[in-house]
Amino acid sequence: MYNKNVAITGSTIEKTTKYDQFREDKIRMELYRIILPLYNEGYRTFTCNPHSYIGLLGADTIIMLREADKCPDITLSAIIPGTTFPADTDKVYRALYDDLMKQADNKEMLPEKEIFSNVLTGSHIVCYYDDFSEEIGQVRASGIPYTNIRKMI
């Protein structure tokens, strides 16, 4: 009952928020509202792609819930692509990424092309994709329950 897992992934920051702080706050609130009930339903391992913006915010939310003792035995698993962040990545997000990688319970490097297929092995998917994107089409076709945060904000 307590070994179910959730994959959190989605678009880049440019496609997600365009660096809009208000939109980022709304995404964080939705992640909190989604992750806490999933944890209470028995999901314990949350796998994030921190190179996707939603994965980075999801990882941060997971750590916050763990530190607040709301989800004491939640596990953060980070899937890291072989590519590095672009040189122009915002320094705040880069620092957040570095901090979260130190706190991740598990880390696995995968080639960029394998990351999305790894997402499709979860018991639930939390994502941020445009309704007409190829990725959301694959999520729908997988039959795995999913929550697309883009529809909530």
Segments predicted by a language model, with ranges:
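Acidic/glycine-enriched connector segments
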Residues: 1-153
